């Protein structure tokens, strides 16, 4: 396995690491108070740093693959899979924290299912689809929104506001987070429609 593919795998491995620091542990009544207190105080900031490292591997694997001619079908698959898993897992955590609407997350997940379906139809014809530019823009807006939302509690704390997700303040700081997330949802819809319209032939020619 070449280096770009290893970086994609690393991105997948970092997903549970990120979520561990985002969410308090509560499993069938088991709630370690010391750990959960640490997560509530410092967890999101640590999760943000881990997420940024994971995002940097996304930038690095593509550049290395192109520079050293290490582009493979496995690499195209892993890169796309790692991106989807990372974004969806982190957004699920934000839904659990009541910071992101489940309805908006559903739009993102449905888009990914649709694109995956198109990729499967293309694969049956021997075509492996690499990520398109509009898809990369979509991913970039998602990464920016997620990183901001992760740093949002720290920004609120510096500003003297409460950052309890159960009683989240509505102010310029949180509105910026809402706007950034809405932009990424809009780009998700646009890129999904672009993907669908440009690949309708796979549906028309499917058995």
What are these regions (language model features)?
Residues 1-207:
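Alpha-helical transmembrane bundles and membrane-interface segments of multipass inner-membrane proteins
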């Amino acid at each position: 396995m070449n280096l770009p593919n290893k970086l994609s795998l690393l991105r997948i491995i970092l997903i549970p690491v990120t979520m561990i620091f985002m969410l308090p542990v509560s499993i069938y009544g088991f709630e370690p108070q010391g750990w959960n207190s640490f997560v509530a105080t410092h967890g999101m900031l640590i999760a943000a740093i881990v997420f940024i490292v994971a995002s940097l591997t996304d930038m690095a694997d593509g550049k290395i693959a192109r520079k050293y001619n290490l582009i493979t079908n496995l690499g195209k698959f892993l890169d796309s899979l790692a991106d989807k898993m990372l974004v969806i897992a982190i957004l699920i955590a934000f839904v659990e924290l009541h910071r992101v609407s489940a309805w908006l997350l559903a739009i993102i997940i449905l888009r990914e299912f649709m694109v995956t379906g198109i990729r499967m139809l293309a694969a049956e014809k021997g075509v492996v689809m690499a990520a398109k530019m509009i898809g990369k823009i979509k991913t970039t807006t998602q990464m920016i929104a997620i990183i901001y939302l992760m740093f949002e509690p720290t920004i609120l704390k510096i500003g003297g506001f409460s950052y309890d997700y159960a009683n989240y303040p509505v102010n310029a700081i949180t509105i910026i987070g809402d706007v950034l997330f809405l932009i990424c949802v809009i780009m998700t819809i646009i890129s999904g429609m672009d993907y669908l319209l440009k690949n309708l032939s796979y549906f028309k020619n499917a058995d």
